[in-house]
Amino acid sequence: MVMVHAPAQVDKAIADGWAAKKTLIGSNEFCLVGPAADPAGIGAARSAAEAYRKVAAAGGPFVSRGDNSGTHQKEMQIWKAAGVEPQGPWYIVTKDFMTASLKRANAERAYFMSDSSTWIMEKGVAPDLTILFRGDRVLVNTYHAIVAPPGATAGRDTAERFIDFVASPEGQRIIAEYGRERFGEGLYNDAAYARQFD
C-alpha cells in the first residue's frame, strides 16, 4: 500500500497494472514562504504562476527539493505554467527532504514551496521566513492511497482493509483531527473537503 500526493503518477501506476483501488483520503495545500520583506513581491501575486515569475524576475533566491517527489513535480508544473525554466545561481537545489530544504531556505533567506502540514509542524526551523502566498487552486495537494492488484503480494488484502478503514468515517475523523491537539490546527483536510479539488 502506498499513500501518495502525485495524482498523475497514481493514474499511471494503475494504467501500468501494478497498482489498484485509487482512494482519495485527504488533502493539504502548498504555500510559498520567504523573507517577510518579500523582495520579489510575491504577496501581491494573483496566482502561483505569477508568484513564480516574480521570483525568477527578481533573481530569487528559490530553494527546490529537486528530488522528483510529489512536491517537486508540483513545483515544476508551476514553473512550466509560469513560462520559466528555473536555472542559474538563484535556483538552489537541495536533493533533500522537506524539513532540511526548509532549513536551507531559511539560511539562504530564500523563497520555498512548503506543504502546509510541514509548515505547521516545522516552521520553528525557519524563523526568518513567513507565508507570503497561498490559496491558488493549483496549490491544493490531494492524497490518494493505492494497493497492489489482487493476488500480487501476501499482505495485499490487509493493506486493502487498511485503506477501507482510512476512507471510513472513523478514519476520516482521525485525518481531519490529526495534529489539532498539539499544533492548534489540523494538519490535513478530509476526503470530503479534498473531493472538490480531485
Feature locations, PLM:
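Exported/periplasmic ABC-transporter solute-binding proteins
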Residues: 6-7, 12-14, 26, 35, ...
